[in-house]
């Protein structure tokens, strides 16, 4: 299909593609083996997966041949949230499954990892070599005294050594955690000091945007401020000698050692991820070996349709959950592409160049990058051979309708566009990619299997074709087993279960359409509420950023002391643009035409740039707090922001408005 009307899909998978999809084969098998519906397609399978939750996850475990070294007593020991218990009695190991392809003689010498840096030189690592290095490093970790439950940390870019260190940690039953090297020392310590690591893997620096960035001073500070460290492992990415008192990476990974996989309980911690921490100390989110194993097999094997013939590239850093998700591509036997570099160096086409050169079949990126490519007027389908790219997936923020159209027109008409949405909290997706369903402009294809995703009003009534709170009414295996340093579970409970007892509220505004798709409107904790009507900030961003003069925008809704409501729109202009009366009028008219008069801001204010979290998300709630008069130190955690100086603009604006 080459065009889309309001009621017609932008893309429709053909019969052959539907038949060949893993989710179709799974449904046919589960119909025979477990009584799943044979007819009705994905919608029927999804309904069964939430109505028969235990049976569905048992089927997933069998379909993907999960190796339980001791059998489970039941699938769900307790389904109450929070606190659901999965597969009690079972023991297993995540890393054993991630390296299983190396056991196949026909595949052992094929690439497991394909590493690319800004020189665009490719460095493959075979399955056999990956398994050997993981085995060697796991043995060295044990020799250092690392035991199950000990935390192992990485201050590393997206390089093969990060994957090897993570898998070796998982192999011994340790708990992995990582930060990207563009994080400053305070940001890293806000995270690592909470979990008290015993080993730290570091680089001497990294390359980004054509420049070398030395990190030896930061590493020295981390060593001083992390008293629980027993060992620091030096990876000489910039070629420096190992500092005194550190261990050399090469020495720890040189042996030819068969990996020994510690068999741990299903709910044994695998890793700790972190929230952005914009308004306080980041939440340290603990997810389990078994929960991540099953959830990622489901997501990557069924929803993303990945298998041994695929190459999986997602632009990410080790400080974002998408890195963990990317590495789990190994579970499906897929070759995982690691790109370490700037998304826009030497030009905005950099990611498309990597996709071409590595033969990526699934390429994932941010919605912001897609829109930047559109604004730069590049033509990936014309300028690069993207014939192997079957799917482009986006996350980080909702992909605007113009982003769907641009990918369709400028990459390929027969392109599966998968806008997905989930969260660090589950290291997965609530809604998104389904290879057997059509793609509608501006919509996520469907809720994911095993996920009873609903849109609720404040009273807990499900809504269709109306904006409501994103809730999940059943447990997922990858939901946090706990937060670190939250002994009574109160912080965990208050994060997700305070509004609807026993039901996960994620904090997004969504619409579930009458044809089963999902629309994301933005965060509900930063929602706009004008004249009693709730509006999503993402809708306004999508409308205003169509204008070529607008690089990025930020909208805030502020309840005034006198009972009024002030809704300013802050705009970062493209080079050469001027915010004059004509542009202000064009901005307001664009919003009025695409949304409604109610969405039109009270003021349009130019700013030097838009502040973001360290993982690239717009900061809305702290800006709102600043505009309400909060002190900067109380409104935001300084270590969580990409450019703290930008926030002074909003603090000064608040002071002027109060004067």
List each model region and its residues.
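Structural core segment of the AMP-binding/adenylate-forming
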Residues: 167, 171-250, 358-359, 366-367
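Conserved pre-ATP/AMP-binding loop-to-beta segment of ANL
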Residues: 109-111, 234, 245-274, 281, ...
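Conserved C-terminal "lid"/linker of ANL adenylate-forming enzymes
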Residues: 231, 554-560, 568-572, 588-659
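Conserved AMP-binding/adenylate-forming core of the ANL superfamily
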Residues: 44-48, 95, 109, 113-167, ...
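Conserved AMP-binding/adenylate-forming
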Residues: 302, 390-517, 524-527, 540
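Adenylate-forming
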Residues: 157, 199-218, 239, 340-344, ...
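AMP-binding/adenylate-forming catalytic core of the ANL superfamily
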Residues: 154, 179-204, 219, 356, ...
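Conserved AMP-binding/adenylation subdomain of ANL enzymes
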Residues: 293-311, 321-361, 376-377
């Amino acid at each position: 299909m080459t065009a889309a009307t309001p009621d017609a899909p932008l893309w429709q998978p053909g019969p052959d593609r539907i038949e060949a999809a893993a989710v179709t084969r799974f449904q046919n098998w589960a119909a025979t083996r477990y009584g799943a519906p044979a007819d009705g397609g994905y919608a029927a399978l999804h309904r069964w997966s939430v109505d028969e939750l235990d049976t569905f996850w048992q089927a997933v475990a069998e379909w993907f041949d999960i190796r339980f070294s001791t059998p489970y007593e039941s699938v769900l020991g307790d389904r109450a949230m929070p606190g659901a218990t999965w597969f009690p009695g079972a023991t297993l190991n995540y890393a054993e499954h991630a390296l299983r392809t190396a056991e196949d003689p026909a595949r052992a010498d094929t690439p497991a990892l394909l590493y690319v840096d800004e020189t665009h030189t490719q460095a493959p690592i075979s399955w056999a070599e990956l398994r050997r290095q993981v085995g060697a490093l796991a043995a060295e970790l044990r020799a250092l005294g690392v035991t199950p439950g000990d935390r192992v940390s990485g201050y590393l870019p997206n390089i093969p050594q990060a994957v090897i260190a993570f898998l070796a940690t998982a192999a011994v039953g340790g708990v992995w955690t990582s930060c990207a090297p563009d994080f400053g020392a305070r940001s890293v310590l806000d995270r690592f000091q909470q979990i008290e690591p015993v080993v730290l893997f570091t680089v001497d620096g990294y390359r980004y945007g054509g420049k070398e960035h030395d990190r030896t001073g930061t590493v020295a500070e981390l060593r001083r401020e992390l008293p629980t460290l027993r060992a620091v492992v030096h990876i000489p990415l910039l070629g420096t000698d190992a500092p005194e008192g550190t261990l050399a990476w090469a020495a720890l990974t040189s042996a030819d050692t068969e990996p020994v996989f510690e068999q741990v309980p299903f709910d044994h911690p695998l890793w700790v991820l972190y929230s952005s921490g914009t308004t306080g100390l980041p939440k340290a989110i603990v997810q389990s070996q078994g929960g991540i194993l099953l959830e990622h097999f489901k997501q990557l094997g069924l929803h993303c349709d990945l298998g041994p013939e695929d190459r999986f590239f997602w632009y990410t850093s080790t400080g974002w959950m998408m890195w963990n998700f990317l590495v789990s591509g190994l579970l499906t036997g897929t070759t995982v592409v690691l790109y370490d570099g700037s998304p826009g160096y030497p030009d905005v086409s950099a990611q498309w160049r990597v996709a071409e050169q590595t033969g990526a079949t699934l390429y994932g990126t941010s919605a912001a990058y897609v829109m930047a490519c559109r604004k730069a007027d590049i033509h990936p389908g014309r300028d690069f051979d993207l014939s192997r790219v079957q799917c482009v997936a986006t996350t980080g923020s909702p992909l605007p309708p113009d982003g769907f159209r641009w990918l369709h027109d400028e990459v390929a008409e027969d392109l599966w566009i998968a806008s997905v949405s989930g969260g660090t909290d589950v290291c997965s997706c609530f809604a998104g990619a389904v290879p057997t369903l059509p793609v509608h402009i501006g919509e996520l294809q469907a809720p994911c299997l095993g996920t009873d995703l609903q849109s609720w009003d404040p009273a807990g009534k499900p809504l269709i074709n109306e904006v409501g709170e994103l809730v999940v009414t059943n447990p997922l295996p990858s939901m946090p087993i706990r937060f670190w340093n939250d002994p009574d579970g109160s912080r965990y409970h208050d994060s997700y279960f305070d509004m609807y007892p026993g039901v996960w509220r994620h904090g997004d505004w969504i619409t579930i359409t009458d044809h089963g798709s999902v629309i994301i409107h933005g965060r509900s904790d930063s929602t706009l509420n004008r004249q009693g009507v709730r509006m999503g900030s993402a809708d306004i961003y999508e409308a205003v950023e169509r204008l070529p003069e607008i690089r990025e925008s930020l909208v805030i809704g502020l309840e005034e002391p006198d009972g009024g409501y002030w809704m300013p729109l802050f705009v970062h202009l493209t080079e050469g643009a001027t915010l004059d009366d004509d542009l202000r009028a064009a901005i307001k008219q664009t919003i009025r035409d695409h949304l409604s008069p109610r969405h039109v801001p009270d003021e349009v204010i130019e700013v030097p740039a838009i502040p973001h979290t360290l993982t690239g998300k717009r900061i809305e709630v702290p800006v709102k707090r600043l505009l309400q008069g909060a002190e900067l130190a109380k409104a935001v955690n300084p270590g969580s922001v990409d450019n703290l100086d930008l926030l002074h603009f909003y603090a000064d604006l608040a002071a002027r408005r109060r004067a």
